């Protein structure tokens, strides 16, 4: 067996399948594009669904890839098992209606066992198969596999409801008796017992049936196009070929673990306690790649996943004695390990480090908040006489604050309390069930649309034309092809067309189709790409359309030109964002309509008003320079050498179009653009907002719409000027400033009157002094307009020796506000208010001499005041 690095394994995999006529599909971004069923790209086939469901026909039906993926369903298992990861690489080979079982099995066995390739010992390989799948069994036998190494397993059948399905055959590597301490042997495989001896390294799915839940599997009908979908985990193959005890002892993780050793001063012992090392090494890989792909930590969706991963890693760092921010220092190591195939981590290292470090520092403050919450929970338990911290509260600490259960247990036991472990497990399971239920399972092969997929007639888009005479080659209506149509809605393909099919954020052209007599026979309401790339015109039929006849196609010129202005402005906006906000602000989505443009981009905070103004000014400067917009067609390598930006989520062929706006912007783009920036006229940002964790959106308008937006603002300003009786618009700021000064003076006068009223009221409050166990205290409900007045009471109380402790409560606008002040060394105001606040259904905290709380139960204010004496 060869000793190969992970990079060598990956490259050998791709080289082997290339030798079998496969095209290499680059690893896609971890953030799915146009797939709401997935939170993350979670498998090698996830990015290829468009090929298997027939919506896109691949140039080559044989595909191979090495795809980075993220799965976080069972995050708690990371580090506890030898092979569980949140981020992993899936090696795959796929056939879309091309080769099937025989080639998949024969070639797979060749790759694994041939001395030219992986050279794994044949006697160490075992295969499982579906019992009724005799063809796979016979094919393995034909390859030379011993019958004793072929294990029938009833679960070896892939199906998710109705649709494509089929048997699968899995390949396992036997690591020997060393990993079978109970000497169970082959029963580990036969009975599907969790073990570390037989390691699954590859799964081959044979999609050949159309599943129908209403009939038994034996009656499933065969698919017209059979497919192959396989997956082999790079981490597992590396562990096997490097002789590593676990995946974590491979060259994919050990450099990270060595850095953690240096930071912690502790040694990684494979035979000892290694959990924290493994969790940190795993999680920083996910963080580095996901942030590099545009996801950012947040409170929902992908952002929540990343925040949780980071917080778990930080807490495990604390277990190793690392108290300062440290995860960000591991990013370069992750980048260096993966650089040969994934250079983007090192390319974006500074940005990734910045995000991780900032999140670590924020979490350090959050830990303090978690400690405060735990203190409050324990204080309430003590007051109620209970001795057990409830599972739901432990889970809230764990889930919201990232507090490990062990830390909660340790601190609670120090205070004499027990832990409700079962309640915590129940809350955890409930959350996991919710998470799993929210994932829409998407298989590799969707329903096949044969009618559209079988359209092979060519169609050419005429970039420069707005009208064209062209032959009608295809009519589709009611999901079937027709020779003619004279009413209703239909899908049309022409040999040539001036109509732009929606793509790359640019909306489709609209327009008309006329016959030889000049009569309009159809109106084009949409244009999309057919599976084989043709422009598929959706039309409302108004006359007769016949396949083979010639028609005049004419786009809506005004609509096209307005869309082009917005599309070119989008390129200018993208470049301005790079210049002003940073290179990390890359496109995450766009829409170029005729009335507006919408641009989504990755950024970790709101764009400031100053930045928005600078962006707007820079874009307009480029417009007013009247720069020519040039478009060339070239190969992808030449385009990249020109510095052209390739946009995330876009699929590029061998030939690409490069759109250049002077030396200001160079992008790969298949859309239509103005010939000169001066045609755009004017650019105005109308809105900037967040649309999700780490993603911002800018709405903008150009040309006439920009002018109208400025007019609307001017009209509003004129209305304000009239109200303020300002004769000129430029005098409005001075008028507003004058009103603000008057308002400030009145507020100051009002505050003075409040202070005098408070002083008068305080005289009565401070007379009501009580004593309990040697502590003099004042506990009173007061009538005030805001919480600030309570602090005014406290300030006056401090000026004289009225009492040792002051407790004030007020009912202000449907809420209860409580203040505790203390001059006594024996009474901690912060601790006292934590005990009192729950009485009014509130919470709070503070320092030894001053604390405040808020609550909602005004009916219990007197109960709170009565409880003060019991605390001394």
Swiss-Prot record:
It catalyses: tRNA(Ala) + L-alanine + ATP = L-alanyl-tRNA(Ala) + AMP + diphosphate. GO terms for molecular function: alanine-tRNA ligase activity; aminoacyl-tRNA deacylase activity; ATP binding; catalytic activity, acting on a protein; transferase activity; tRNA binding; zinc ion binding. It is an enzyme of class 6 (ligase). The keyword Zinc applies. The keyword Protein biosynthesis applies. It comes from the Bacteria. InterPro entries: aa-tRNA-synth_II/BPL/LPL, Ala-tRNA-lgiase_IIc, Ala-tRNA-ligase_IIc_anticod-bd, Ala-tRNA-synth_IIc_core, Ala-tRNA-synth_IIc_N, Ala-tRNA_ligase, Ala_tRNA_ligase_euk/bac, DHHA1_dom. SMART domains: tRNA_SAD (SM00863). Its EC number is 6.1.1.7. Pfam families: DHHA1 (PF02272), tRNA-synt_2c (PF01411), tRNA_SAD (PF07973). It is found in: Cytoplasm. One of its GO terms (cellular component) is cytosol. Zn(2+) binds at residues 567, 571, 669, 673. Signal peptide: none annotated. PROSITE patterns: AA_TRNA_LIGASE_II_ALA. GO terms for biological process: alanyl-tRNA aminoacylation. Binds 1 zinc ion per subunit. Its cofactor is Zn(2+). Keywords: Aminoacyl-tRNA synthetase, ATP-binding, Cytoplasm, Ligase, Metal-binding, Nucleotide-binding, Protein biosynthesis, RNA-binding, tRNA-binding, Zinc. Consists of three domains; the N-terminal catalytic domain, the editing domain and the C-terminal C-Ala domain. The editing domain removes incorrectly charged amino acids, while the C-Ala domain, along with tRNA(Ala), serves as a bridge to cooperatively bring together the editing and aminoacylation centers thus stimulating deacylation of misacylated tRNAs. Catalyzes the attachment of alanine to tRNA(Ala) in a two-step reaction: alanine is first activated by ATP to form Ala-AMP and then transferred to the acceptor end of tRNA(Ala). Also edits incorrectly charged Ser-tRNA(Ala) and Gly-tRNA(Ala) via its editing domain. NCBIfam families: alaS (TIGR00344). Belongs to the class-II aminoacyl-tRNA synthetase family. This is Alanine--tRNA ligase.
């Amino acid at each position: 067996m060869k000793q190969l690095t992970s990079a060598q394994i990956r490259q050998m995999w791709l080289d082997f399948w290339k030798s079998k006529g496969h095209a290499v599909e680059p690893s896609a971004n971890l953030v799915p594009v146009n797939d709401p069923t997935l939170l993350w790209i979670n498998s090698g086939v996830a990015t290829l669904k468009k090929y298997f469901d027939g919506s896109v026909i691949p140039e080559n039906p044989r595909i191979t890839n090495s795809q980075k993926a993220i799965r976080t369903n069972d995050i708690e298992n990371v580090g506890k098992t030898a092979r569980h990861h949140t981020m992993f690489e899936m090696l795959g080979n796929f056939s879309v209606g091309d080769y099937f079982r025989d080639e998949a099995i024969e070639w797979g066995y060749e790759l694994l066992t041939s001395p030219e390739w992986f050279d794994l010992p044949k006697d160490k390989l075992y295969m499982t198969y579906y019992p009724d799948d005799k063809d796979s069994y016979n094919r393995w036998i034909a390859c030379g596999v011993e019958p004793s190494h072929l294990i029938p397993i009833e679960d070896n059948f892939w199906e998710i409801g109705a649709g494509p399905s089929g048997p699968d055959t899995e390949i396992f590597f036997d690591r020997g008796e060393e990993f079978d301490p109970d000497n169970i042997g082959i029963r580990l495989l036969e009975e599907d017992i969790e073990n570390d001896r037989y390691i699954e390294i590859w799964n081959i799915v044979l999609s050949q049936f159309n599943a129908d839940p209403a009939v038994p599997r034996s009656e499933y009908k065969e698919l017209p196009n059979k497919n192959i979908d396989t997956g082999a985990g790079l981490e597992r193959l590396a562990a096997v070929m490097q002789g590593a005890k676990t995946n974590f002892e491979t060259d994919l993780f050990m450099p990270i673990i060595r850095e953690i050793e240096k930071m912690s001063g502790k040694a990684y012992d494979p035979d000892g306690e290694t959990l924290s090392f493994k969790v940190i090494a795993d999680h920083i890989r996910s963080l580095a790649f996901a942030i590099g792909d545009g996801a950012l930590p947040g409170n929902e969706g992908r952002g929540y996943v990343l925040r949780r991963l980071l917080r778990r890693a930080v807490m495990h760092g604390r277990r190793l004695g690392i108290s300062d921010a440290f995860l960000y220092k591991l990013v370069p190591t992750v980048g260096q390990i993966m650089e040969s195939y994934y250079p983007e981590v090192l390319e974006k290292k500074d940005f990734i480090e910045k995000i991780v470090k900032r999140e670590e520092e924020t979490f350090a403050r959050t830990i303090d908040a978690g400690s405060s919450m735990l203190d409050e929970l324990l204080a309430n338990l003590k007051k109620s006489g209970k001795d057990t911290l409830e599972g739901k509260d432990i889970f809230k600490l764990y889930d919201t604050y990232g507090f490990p259960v062990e830390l909660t247990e340790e601190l609670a036991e120090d205070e004499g309390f027990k832990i409700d472990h079962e309640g915590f497990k129940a809350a955890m399971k409930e959350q996991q069930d919710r998470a799993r239920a929210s994932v829409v399972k998407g298989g590799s092969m969707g329903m096949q649309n044969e009618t559209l997929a079988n359209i092979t007639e060519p169609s050419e888009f005429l970039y420069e034309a707005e009208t064209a005479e062209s032959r009608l080659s295809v009519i589709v209506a009611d999901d079937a092809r027709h020779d003619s149509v004279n009413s209703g809605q239909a899908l049309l393909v022409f040999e040539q067309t001036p109509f732009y099919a929606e793509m790359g954020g640019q909306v489709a052209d609209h327009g008309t189709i006329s016959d030889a007599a000049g009569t309009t026979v159809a109106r084009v309401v949409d244009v999309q790409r057919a599976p084989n790339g043709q422009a598929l015109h959706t039309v409302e039929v108004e006359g007769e359309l016949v396949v083979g006849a010639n028609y005049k196609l004419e786009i809506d010129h005004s609509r096209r030109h307005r869309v082009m202005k917005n599309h070119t402005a989008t390129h200018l906006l993208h470049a301005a964002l790079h210049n002003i906000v940073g290179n990390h602000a890359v496109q995450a989505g766009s829409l170029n309509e005729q009335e507006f443009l919408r641009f989504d981009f990755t950024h970790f905070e709101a764009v400031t008003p100053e930045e928005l103004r600078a962006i707007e000014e820079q874009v307009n400067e480029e417009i007013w320079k009247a720069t020519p917009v040039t478009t060339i067609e070239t190969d992808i390598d030449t385009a990249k050498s020109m510095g052209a930006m390739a946009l995330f989520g876009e699929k590029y062929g061998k030939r690409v179009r490069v759109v250049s706006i002077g030396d200001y912007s160079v992008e790969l783009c298949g859309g239509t653009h103005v010939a000169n920036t001066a045609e755009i006229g004017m650019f105005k940002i109308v809105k900037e907002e967040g649309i999700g964790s780490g993603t911002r959106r800018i709405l903008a308008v150009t040309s006439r719409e920009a002018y109208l937006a400025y007019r609307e603002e001017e009209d509003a300003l004129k209305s304000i000027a009239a109200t303020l009786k300002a004769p000129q618009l430029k005098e409005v700021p001075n008028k507003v400033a004058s009103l603000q000064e008057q308002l400030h003076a009145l507020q100051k006068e009002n505050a003075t009157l409040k202070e005098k009223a408070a002083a008068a009221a305080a005289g009565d409050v401070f007379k009501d002094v009580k004593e309990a166990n040697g502590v003099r205290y004042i506990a009173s409900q007061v009538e005030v307009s805001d919480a600030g007045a309570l602090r005014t009471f406290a300030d006056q109380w401090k000026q004289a020796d009225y009492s040792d402790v002051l407790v004030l409560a007020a009912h202000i606008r449907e809420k209860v506000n409580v203040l505790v002040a203390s001059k006594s060394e024996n009474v901690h105001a912060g601790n006292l208010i934590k005990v009192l606040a729950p009485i009014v259904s509130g919470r709070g905290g503070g320092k030894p001499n001053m604390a405040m709380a808020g609550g909602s139960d005004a009916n219990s204010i007197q109960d709170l005041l009565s409880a003060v004496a019991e605390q001394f």
